Amino acid sequence: MSVDIHSEKILILDFGSQYTQLIARRVREAHVYCELHPFDLELAAIRSFAPSGIILSGGPKSVYEEGAPAVAEELFELGVPVLGICYGMQLMSRHFGGEVVPAGKREFGHAELLAQGTPGPLFDGFFLDGKSPVWMSHGDHVSQVPEGFQVAAGTANAPVCAIQNLACNLYGVQFHPEVNHTPRGEQLIDTFVRKICGCSGKWTPGQIIEDAVARIKQQVGSDRVILGLSGGVDSSVAAALIHRAIGEQLTCVFVDNGLLRLGEGDQVMATFAQNLGVKVIRVDAEDRFLSALAGVSDPEKKRKIIGGLFVEIFEEESNKITDARWLAQGTIYPDVIESAGAKTGKAHNIKSHHNVGGLPEHMKLKLLEPLRELFKDEVRAIGEELGLPHQMVWRHPFPGPGLGVRILGEVRKDYADILRQADAIYIEELYAADHYHKISQAFAVFLPVKSVGVMGDGRTYEYVVALRAVETKDFMTAGWYPLPYEDLARISSRIINEVKGINRVVYDISSKPPATIEWE
């Protein structure tokens, strides 16, 4: 008997916080389905959604500002548990008659939370010896708690940092439990969705696959599907999932655009022939892509050109396939987050994504995106459940535009050849030194600037390569990976000696934010 994986669900209302998608990630980690919607979702839509619980996100506004974001008045009367985070807690407090004022001292960063009174079930196991480290990011605070609420915790600078109304199952926290900097925050969100909201945890890899297979069959019917295969985790898992659902109705098109990693084209063909048994058509399109990118240096324009040309080629290939009606993509949730504000339109558009931008308005193929609601590690878990090779599943993310956004400025064939070699050496050394699987994403970047060097008795004037390696749990925030100096020295020496055209290697130690993981 199939399980309805959507029967238990959490509604997350987005007030514009950069961390909102992390809340969804933590709910998913508790094996509970959730959806993210704008804060002004109508009450009728909320009732129709029938959430097991509601989470109100943080946001950049102040609740006492004119036109400040607010929720439907009756939301708190629906009888479902509500957790307000940061702005969400302030909104809840003000709604019930509490007071919110500008803080005398703003809190940003680490803080020590101190338990007060008798913290309710939300805080089971959250405090050790009455204390818990948390991450703060607020300029306002609750100065007077509403009637019916009790203070559960505070800090030296803000006496009211957690509130609770046990009779109504309403909770608020001023800190951010969704970020990694709050060590036991993940546990707190798990407690909310599992213990307080009563969700049992039906959102598991096996059940997600079963549900996705059924949905794909229903959506596609007897139509044929064409999928753009890159060899990366997302398109590989999408191919395996769709193939399980519709078998020979799927044809994968592997576009060799001249912007892939060293030897990647041959590896992709060999891997899928051996492991998936999927029909794959290889298209050599290097000249078309490099010609289209000639003279283009703006990263957004490059992304649009690459995305548009991919779709154009897919359409050409689909015309050769009888009854091809669908274009499948490996779009995942973080792609949608960065490009479209997670469907809310409330988040700032940092950069367009290859899978969700650059599509022609009158595309002849309908889009099939079976992974678009999944985070990266959910995709990996599904890939393993589907039996894909471990090395394929755990390969670092590679952008859809490929080396096109790892070559700063104009893309040229000689630049791509240099970068391919440098990147291959870098990744090879990370494997050899047992760093690769400890790093979330690592790659080389080609900088189209020259610097003076000395090799032998001669002067050189050659290009620069930057190395990037980051650690992250969710790709929403990331820290740079501290490679040992001796490893950096060895990698640099190999690249400079083995790659013609490079005489300088630098290491990127920027975190996200303020920098993004990719340079473009």
UniProtKB/Swiss-Prot annotation:
Pathway field: Purine metabolism; GMP biosynthesis; GMP from XMP (L-Gln route): step 1/1
State the protein's purpose: Catalyzes the synthesis of GMP from XMP.
Q: How does it assemble?
A: Homodimer.
Q: Which residues form the GMPS ATP-PPase domain?
A: 203-395
What GO molecular function annotation could you give as one example from this UniProt entry? ATP binding
According to UniProt, the reaction catalysed is: XMP + L-glutamine + ATP + H2O = GMP + L-glutamate + AMP + diphosphate + 2 H(+)
Do you know which Gene3D superfamilies this protein is assigned to? 3.30.300.10, 3.40.50.880, HUPs
**Species lineage:** Bacteria, Pseudomonadati, Thermodesulfobacteriota, Desulfuromonadia, Geobacterales
Q: Which EC number(s) are documented for this chain?
A: 6.3.5.2
Binding positions for ATP? S230, G231, G232, V233, D234, S235, S236
In what residue span(s) does the Glutamine amidotransferase type-1 domain sit?
Answer: 9-202
A single Gene Ontology CC annotation of this entry is:
cytosol
What's the protein name?
Answer: GMP synthase [glutamine-hydrolyzing]
**From which source organism is this entry?**
Geotalea daltonii (strain DSM 22248 / JCM 15807 / FRC-32)
Q: Which NCBIfam families match?
A: guaA_Cterm, guaA_Nterm, PRK00074.1
Q: Active site located where?
A: C86 (nucleophile), H176, E178
- Which is an annotated Pfam family here? GATase
Keyword terms? ATP-binding, Glutamine amidotransferase, GMP biosynthesis, Ligase, Nucleotide-binding, Purine biosynthesis
